[in-house]
Each structure stands twice: as structure tokens, then as C-alpha cells.
Amino acid sequence: KPPWRL
């Protein structure tokens, strides 16, 4: 889970 997608 990337920072821009959570």
C-alpha cells in the first residue's frame, strides 16, 4: 500500500 493509495 503506497502512500498515495493507502
Swiss-Prot record:
Its main location: secreted. GO terms for biological process: defense response. It is found in: Secreted. It comes from the Eukaryota. It comes from Pithecopus azureus (Orange-legged monkey tree frog). The modification Leucine amide is found at residue 6. GO terms for cellular component: extracellular region. The lineage of its organism: Eukaryota, Metazoa, Chordata, Craniata, Vertebrata. The keyword DNA damage does not apply. Keywords: Amidation, Amphibian defense peptide, Hydroxylation, Secreted. Expressed by the skin glands. The modification 4-hydroxyproline is found at residue 3. Belongs to the frog skin active peptide (FSAP) family. Tryptophillin subfamily. This is Tryptophyllin-T2-6.
